[in-house]
Amino acid sequence: MPLAQLADPWQKMAVESPSDSAENGQQIMDEPMGEEEINPQTEEVSIKEIAITHHVKEGHEKADPSQFELLKVLGQGSFGKVFLVKKISGSDARQLYAMKVLKKATLKVRDRVRTKMERDILVEVNHPFIVKLHYAFQTEGKLYLILDFLRGGDLFTRLSKEVMFTEEDVKFYLAELALALDHLHSLGIIYRDLKPENILLDEEGHIKLTDFGLSKESIDHEKKAYSFCGTVEYMAPEVVNRRGHTQSADWWSFGVLMFEMLTGTLPFQGKDRKETMTMILKAKLGMPQFLSPEAQSLLRMLFKRNPANRLGAGPDGVEEIKRHSFFSTIDWNKLYRREIHPPFKPATGRPEDTFYFDPEFTAKTPKDSPGIPPSANAHQLFRGFSFVAITSDDESQAMQTVGVHSIVQQLHRNSIQFTDGYEVKEDIGVGSYSVCKRCIHKATNMEFAVKIIDKSKRDPTEEIEILLRYGQHPNIITLKDVYDDGKYVYVVTELMKGGELLDKILRQKFFSEREASAVLFTITKTVEYLHAQGVVHRDLKPSNILYVDESGNPESIRICDFGFAKQLRAENGLLMTPCYTANFVAPEVLKRQGYDAACDIWSLGVLLYTMLTGYTPFANGPDDTPEEILARIGSGKFSLSGGYWNSVSDTAKDLVSKMLHVDPHQRLTAALVLRHPWIVHWDQLPQYQLNRQDAPHLVKGAMAATYSALNRNQSPVLEPVGRSTLAQRRGIKKITSTAL
């Protein structure tokens, strides 16, 4: 099976040298090619002047620099800068873009040609998996390209550091990439620079192919290009020996990417550039046997040194690849329409967040002026239209040690103090390890909330990652900023001006089942979304469900406080895609995850019970002891008849009983709650006022007592280590730590 067989799925694998035989693996290479013209120093350049004309976004007016507000510097080099910009006029006002600004005077002729090429190719291209050029214009001294601002980072560095994936997951990305390449080929464009950093993720997790500076337009399939360009490890043999190459070269590079995604290593990588090129031309490569037969077959058909024999090079083009058995489960039409959910959603945060960009640039004041040429070891100008700054070797090693928490560590490199940007106001709430305060952003005078977390008491990493990854959901609290002063972490979020959901509902004199159904639908839909992503909240008490404004509309509900939330992870700490979870996760891990998800539903059942009757199911008031409350919860007994229940419909009672079932395995899942008749047929529910207990202070006290009893730090009863099924399965004699 793929990747699951490796303790570390991204460990280096031994690749045979040209002289080695491949006794342990099946050979996938055909005849070696000569190396008549290996010369990594040469590159053919067309010497010609160019004129970049304007390009205007369809349905919009002609653009110029004055229409864009500079927000941040994303990258800088000797002949230009890349800015995060906001359009300030026109029908797309407030839209964020990446603006690539090139100073004509410092552009070499070669770079001018490449800039023209980027612009011309992007004008022709309109595809869901290719970066889009929205505007192109020039002033007397500068060239401007206005492009998609892609916040997800590049596919490989993000997923290799954060996520465990399977062949099924890899298949999704390769399929989207195949459609993007085919579209370019249909326009007569050879991509030629296919490499990991040129495959970006948008905020949903779909790919975007970027950086067309090395692409070469050809008139037809027989037209060959001879320039020596691209990244050597991904080059096809015919590119290396400069005999001329066609679009078939891209399918070789496609195979290299596939091999790298499935094994974590490059198929051809020598100690230097020349040795790598020799390996590409002559080396035999053993096929990793943990790959499926379908994956091995596709790799063999892509790694043909004769480009005419390569899959995708025939008259049917990409259809040959789409028909291959490796892609048999892909619905290509649904894929093109972006109807297939990506395996992984990047932690992108707000639209204007630049967490994947180097703070060396993003901390600078944005000014549209020529950049000072960087020193020899400064960051490279751009990595394609994604503008993700390349890290130095030292930083690269540091990033590898950061591991799964790299996103948060990157956030915390901000040296600015929280109080420099915000004015702290009164307390909103106080917890055992944090305090929440109202604060005002000094630059904009806007109100926010800040959760100040004591790092000695709790690691906020998981909470911040979850908010970054899922905070764009309309009913999850939005993360605005993060600061770390060493002792405390300051998590800035939108301010919940509408207060707690239960407060508002209990104060509302007129409240019907139809309104209760709309509220529960909104919350459960959000919880279902989290559970589908492998996230459990684990603290869904009513005080963590609030309104962002005072409208009282279900759309303004926000689930807050992810301090106890968990993301499903593998033993090595990497996140797991749904496909990985289904295939390779230990039963006890899934059991725990299922239990936590069932606890989330139980909490929503308590909320529903209280909304309908005005009192809680397991506590009569704030004076009930924890023992009394826990005994009632454990018995699973609660009343659904008489008194205030007389005004409640039978379908509502049925849903409450199934959400509060004492056995978590028999409790409804979030998806089943959403399919319950009381939710589905909300428009048929009674609109008359529910007859509820009118004692909000008692309900608040009883609810607080309920969750206080549940969250008590009880001393666990420990049994002998040998009794543990996990210990028995692994043959462990001694357990050094226990996670409860």
Swiss-Prot record:
User: What CDD domains does the entry give?
Assistant: STKc_RSK2_C, STKc_RSK_N
Uppermost EC category: transferase
**This enzyme's EC code(s):** 2.7.11.1
Which tissues is it found in, per the record? Expressed in many tissues, highest levels in skeletal muscle.
* Binding residues for ATP: 74-82, 100, 428-436, 451
List residues of the Protein kinase domain: 68-327, 422-679
**GO annotation (BP), single:** positive regulation of cell differentiation
Q: Could you give one GO CC term from the UniProt record?
A: nucleolus
Q: What is this protein called?
A: Ribosomal protein S6 kinase alpha-3
Q: Quick one: which gene encodes this?
A: RPS6KA3
